[in-house]
Amino acid sequence: MVEEENIRVVRCGGSELNFRRAVFSADSKYIFCVSGDFVKVYSTVTEECVHILHGHRNLVTGIQLNPNNHLQLYSCSLDGTIKLWDYIDGILIKTFIVGCKLHALFTLAQAEDSVFVIVNKEKPDIFQLVSVKLPKSSSQEVEAKELSFVLDYINQSPKCIAFGNEGVYVAAVREFYLSVYFFKKKTTSRFTLSSSRNKKHAKNNFTCVACHPTEDCIASGHMDGKIRLWRNFYDDKKYTYTCLHWHHDMVMDLAFSVTGTSLLSGGRESVLVEWRDATEKNKEFLPRLGATIEHISVSPAGDLFCTSHSDNKIIIIHRNLEASAVIQGLVKDRSIFTGLMIDPRTKALVLNGKPGHLQFYSLQSDKQLYNLDIIQQEYINDYGLIQIELTKAAFGCFGNWLATVEQRQEKETELELQMKLWMYNKKTQGFILNTKINMPHEDCITALCFCNAEKSEQPTLVTASKDGYFKVWILTDDSDIYKKAVGWTCDFVGSYHKYQATNCCFSEDGSLLAVSFEEIVTIWDSVTWELKCTFCQRAGKIRHLCFGRLTCSKYLLGATENGILCCWNLLSCALEWNAKLNVRVMEPDPNSENIAAISQSSVGSDLFVFKPSEPRPLYIQKGISREKVQWGVFVPRDVPESFTSEAYQWLNRSQFYFLTKSQSLLTFSTKSPEEKLTPTSKQLLAEESLPTTPFYFILGKHRQQQDEKLNETLENELVQLPLTENIPAISELLHTPAHVLPSAAFLCSMFVNSLLLSKETKSAKEIPEDVDMEEEKESEDSDEENDFTEKVQDTSNTGLGEDIIHQLSKSEEKELRKFRKIDYSWIAAL
């Protein structure tokens, strides 16, 4: 039984990976990135999440390696703390309490026991760079209140701050100003570019800055796409700068290589540019990276780069400008038109992704599985261009079919509308376009749904539109003369007094179709397409419509724009009950009778879980989110929970996810955020908490078979070998972090000694009597050996202190031959 705990709202993934620059480990094996309240540690080779560092109570705003120990990581947050982590083991070492909001973090090897952070001044839009001294203490929580002012009136973005020439100076940019602070002189030089007010069409605004690691050179990016290289900036009057120009739009980020021989730049062109020797002639390109480059990072070893993109993606790039790995998070589109769907096959969350794409996102591993290109056109990044939007999507026939709707409307009278139907192909394990229908309706499509009844003989799709009609589309096999191809055709067109059709849905058994026409709900027979009855409460236009399920399949629910939730009984064709509730999201659970409704109020969003047969809610939780909730979906559980409390039983078979206006993906759980967000590799344990890797699933059965054969062999040989998992030396060898292990010579001797057999295992008394005749002979020889052993012991007790040298007896030779026959191949499996 599950221990009863309070249900809490937890973030289940989808946080921004591109919020801050990613940071490489010293050996380039790991990459760290900010993800909401957490810091995620990814492998640069496998792209898998190795650790999730959780402990901050607010948004993490900066991460940096500890310059004095490259196996440790600093992080800062809006919660006013700086935390020190051991990222190898995922352990929090120490917390420094600063006490004010921290917006960025910087470290310098030259500044011992100090870090640099960006904090708020008195006014909310004015920030300053300060140095924080980290006191040495044995306690895990330490107050760090000693702040030293460095620079004032700076930008809060860490891209606008850079330390140069091994910490000799720090540069900061804001608007049209460049400030350089020299630590030894404790002086500040300021440089100004002409503003757009003084020069026509000028876009000299600073957007980012980077400093040469060993020379006095500052690179600044600008709104007009230019890169300026500043030199001789020790003198306010004799400074010089040169321009590099390739980007047609603003420069988003800059980064020097470790040696400083090349400069990396990126922007909205989705192209990484490498300026070698900082000249116009020597530049290399890595194009088609898929989205705007937000950040650029360089590994301390210099062998890897990485770019963070606006589509919540991190690309790891080799020194020769070849992409080697992609870490893709939940893509946050400008607006989610399709809502949240669940792919019946993969149980992946499906919603709008990149422009014109559907993204399939794994809720278990918090990573994107793949993208499906729906529009199949090249995306042009232009602010004034009206793009084709993917507005609707729905799965049908248990994942065998996918329907999508795309539209583009430049003027009210110029509507481009397309509906596409995709068939799942088992060979390619993906969706293939089957039918494309131009202008399926004369106006925008408001809803579409499949008939997903188990007994449905023919796939059926219904679309509703503002043109006042709903259309029924069926799959036919007469699309060519050979009848080998299938396609979708319109089978029926229905309307109700030319009202706009706003919603549609099928009953659980597929026998009825409900279509809402503004304030009126109509019920149609799905066989004859005859109108059965209508419901009209005049409570406003129907916003949401759904049938009850299982024992509540006789009920139909509708939520109106005026804040009324209605429940109709289909058997009596009458209103069962209604409630005043401003429902923004209403989703039925596919595995139970429960329905989740999220209402919007001036304070925030509230959750109500109820059954249509009972107007009293099963569960109510106020204030699940301060912002507006846009979409929700139930996801069936692979392994049901076993909550006994009536208030929590709605979570037994399915889990409810919802998406807020800021596109934060949240869910309800009794587990803490740490337990909820622990990666799969930490949940599946094997062999004393060793993580289950993909190789384990490939070789696991083979290992088990080998172990079984080994056990049989050992039983036949009647020799009891020690269990390796119970040997402290081996456990210590396998579980101790590599950086704290002793030398290999010491480990080797300790390991070999731990495998040696004790004399007790060779005792003749432990050998059964019902063995074969050969073993009985050996037992007689062992008696002689015991006599010989007693003589040797008597001799050794004479106190002479000399080594006794003797020849092996026949019984000893037989015993050695016996050990030669033992299969020691199990050692190789360690």
UniProtKB/Swiss-Prot annotation:
The modification N6-acetyllysine is found at K466. GO terms for molecular function: RNA binding. There is a cross-link at K123, K427, K676 (Glycyl lysine isopeptide (Lys-Gly) (interchain with G-Cter in SUMO2)). Its main location: nucleus. It is found in: Nucleus, Nucleolus. Keywords: Acetylation, Isopeptide bond, Nucleus, Phosphoprotein, Repeat, Ribosome biogenesis, rRNA processing, Transcription, Transcription regulation, Ubl conjugation, WD repeat. Residues 763-806 are annotated as: Disordered. Residues 769-787 have a biased composition (Acidic residues). The keyword 4Fe-4S does not apply. WD repeats lie at residues 4-43, 47-86, 90-131, 145-184, 193-231, 237-276, 279-318, 324-362, 376-423, 430-474, 487-525, 529-569, 574-611. One of its GO terms (cellular component) is nucleoplasm. GO terms for biological process: positive regulation of rRNA processing; positive regulation of transcription by RNA polymerase I; ribosomal small subunit biogenesis; rRNA processing. The modification Phosphoserine is found at S664, S672, S779, S782, S796, S811. Component of the proposed t-UTP subcomplex of the ribosomal small subunit (SSU) processome. SSU processome is composed of more than 70 proteins and the RNA chaperone small nucleolar RNA (snoRNA) U3. Ribosome biogenesis factor. Part of the small subunit (SSU) processome, first precursor of the small eukaryotic ribosomal subunit. During the assembly of the SSU processome in the nucleolus, many ribosome biogenesis factors, an RNA chaperone and ribosomal proteins associate with the nascent pre-rRNA and work in concert to generate RNA folding, modifications, rearrangements and cleavage as well as targeted degradation of pre-ribosomal RNA by the RNA exosome. Involved in nucleolar processing of pre-18S ribosomal RNA. Required for optimal pre-ribosomal RNA transcription by RNA polymerase I. This is WD repeat-containing protein 75.
